[in-house]
Structure formats: C-alpha cells, structure tokens
Regions:
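Rossmann-fold NAD(P) dinucleotide-binding segment
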Residues: 53-62, 66-89, 95
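Rossmann-fold NAD(P)-binding glycine/threonine-rich loop
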Residues: 73-77, 89-106, 115-123, 132-143
Length: 265
C-alpha cells in the first residue's frame, strides 16, 4: 500500500517505521518544516503549499495525518480534494464541525461510483488497540453502573510536557461515552461543557516524557472501580494508525476506530 504522511514529528516518524515494517511504501511526506527524509532517498519533505498538489501525494492509497490542531482540518480537506482517504490522529480541534459540513471538495478527482461520497476518513482521539478496547469497556461499564446507581465517575490523564491540548482527546472521548449513559435523561440534551467533560471531571497532568496514562475511576460509598490504560511507548498508537489505514483503503465516508476493530457496542 502507498502511504502519504502528513506531519513528520515523533508520531510521523514512528508511523513511518511501522508502515515500512509491514511492507508498505511511503510515497510522500508533508510537513511545515522541510528536512531530509531517509525513506525518500534523500528527497526533501514537501511543504503543504506544494505537497498536496504533487504527483507523489496523489499516488497515495491513504494519507495518515498527525500534525497540529490548527492545521488538521485544512490538511484533511486538502487531501480529500485530491481524492486521497485520510486517517487523522490530531486532537484539540473541531472534529464534529468538519464531520457535519464535509462534502466532496473536488468531485472531478473522485470515481463516478463515489461522486456523492467523500473519500474515506477515520478520526480517532487514540489509535492504540488497548485504548479502543478501553473505550468499549468504559462505555459498557457506564451503562451497568447507571443501572446500579450510587457511583460517581472521574477521569485522570497524564502525558508528556510537549502535548499541546488538555484534557487529552482520549479523556474527552471517555467522558463523552460516560455522560449519555449516566446523566442524560429523556428530553435532556446533556453535552460536554468545556474541559470538565460535562458532568465527568477530568484531571490533566503534564510531566516528563510520559506516552500516556488514562484512568477512569468510579467511586461509591462502599467501593471503587478503576479502569486504567498505560502506554509504554508511541509504537502502539502508530501500529493502530497503520491498521486503520489498511482497513480504510478503498472506502468512502466517515468511519471510526471502533469499526476497524469491530468494537461497536
């Protein structure tokens, strides 16, 4: 499979390594800071203004986007305009806003059979296989404890000092999955409210080079239930992104990591 990378920071480099180890080809890299790239035989990385229009980018089966919050939507739209599906892992931007308004940006680039559907997109706040299992278990546990009653949830997330957004997109996803089950009633449009995750408080900690720790705590008067995921490195996130790209190839429309893993509950 031919892969384009959008963003060539630590995650981009890890994704490159995993993709190559699985037999894929990196045909294009787009980054705001062009530097020599070993996987392209010494060629320089494209800047966004030239990269998306390049023959190299258009030859990709899928693009994997890990950039910055302010650039993510623009990058996705530019990729789709060239008919290239996108796996996006950038957090801290208005994903739902894009999802609600997304249309084929350039119908001439799409095959006739997909003229009314944009090229495939997967966005996830976390591509780790383990975290996506955590999402599924968290959602199910919230439903069980809603029936039991008497439990109060809270979330703690810990990341390295370089992470730009807080709380993490993963923590927000966990809170989003808890809130409807635990707090929403018929006729009540409960929504996330800023950084506290609606009715679910989130504590964000930034320290050292921690790849990522997420803990969901349910406390009652008599006991405590805890769900916890701790990443050992970025490799798990990179592998999940490549698995998502393999699954997305040839598909149209908006998809989720839960679909990739068959975890829809």
């Amino acid at each position: 499979m031919k892969i384009a990378l959008i963003g060539y920071g630590k995650m981009g480099r890890m994704i490159e390594s995993v993709a190559l180890s699985r037999g894929h080809e990196i045909v294009c890299i787009i980054d705001a800071q062009p530097i020599p790239c070993p996987s392209l035989n010494g060629k320089k990385i494209f800047t966004p203004d030239k990269g998306f229009a390049s023959e190299a980018f258009r030859s990709a089966d899928v693009a994997i986007e890990f950039s910055r919050p302010e650039a993510a939507e623009r990058n996705i739209r530019a990729a789709l305009a060239q008919g290239v599906p996108v796996v996006c892992g950038t957090t801290g931007w208005d994903v739902e806003g894009l999802k609600a308004t997304l249309k084929p940006s350039n119908p001439q680039t799409l095959k006739p059979s997909t003229i009314n559907e944009h090229p495939g997109v997967i966005w996830s706040s976390n591509y780790s296989v383990g975290v996506n299992i955590l999402f599924a278990v968290n959602k199910y546990l919230a439903q069980l404890l809603q029936r039991a009653g008497g439990y109060t949830p809270s979330i703690t997330e810990v990341h390295h000092v370089h992470k730009l957004d807080a709380p993490s997109g993963t923590a927000k996803t966990l809170a989003e999955d808890i809130s409807p089950a635990l707090f929403s009633k018929e006729g009540d449009n409960t929504r996330l409210n800023g950084e506290c995750g609606g009715n679910v408080p989130i504590t964000s900690i930034r320290e050292g080079e921690v790849p990522g720790i997420h803990e969901v705590r349910w406390e009652s008067e008599v006991d405590i239930l805890t769900l916890r995921h701790e990443a050992k490195s970025r490799q798990g996130f990179a592998l999940g992104a490549v698995l998502a790209a393999e699954w997305l190839r040839g598909k149209t429309g908006w998809h989720s990591m839960a679909e990739v893993m068959g975890l829809n509950i």
